[in-house]
């Protein structure tokens, strides 16, 4: 499942133009997302919280879309994560991410 989420359109360009870099990125992805302790769904929810805390609108939307499409993560599950973001990163990060979630 993780490969379906990771290998999107942008990675096709990297694979074609920079195959050595692509191989390194794939190895890093496989090393990070092992599923040994936390399953991929949990790791994806953590990733959403991280990008939401950084207020990176493009990354927030990409992470949320792939989470819902590829992993079946619900808006309610994402909202739970965003409530943690509210406590750890403040209202601006929370409201920005919630607005993005509401549009999806």
From Swiss-Prot:
GO terms for molecular function: oxidoreductase activity; peroxiredoxin activity. It holds the Pfam family CMD. It comes from the Archaea. Coiled coil: none annotated. To M.jannaschii MJ1511. This is Uncharacterized protein MJ0742.
């Amino acid at each position: 499942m993780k490969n379906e989420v990771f290998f999107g359109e942008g990675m096709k360009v990297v694979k074609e133009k920079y195959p050595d870099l692509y191989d390194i990125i794939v190895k890093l992805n496989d090393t990070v997302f092992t599923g040994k302790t936390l399953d991929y769904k949990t790791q994806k929810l953590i990733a959403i919280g991280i990008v939401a805390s950084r207020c990176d609108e493009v990354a927030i939307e990409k992470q949320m879309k792939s989470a819902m499409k590829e992993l079946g993560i619900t808006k309610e599950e994402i909202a739970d994560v965003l409530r943690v973001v509210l406590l750890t990163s403040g209202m601006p990060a929370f409201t920005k991410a919630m607005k993005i979630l509401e549009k999806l």
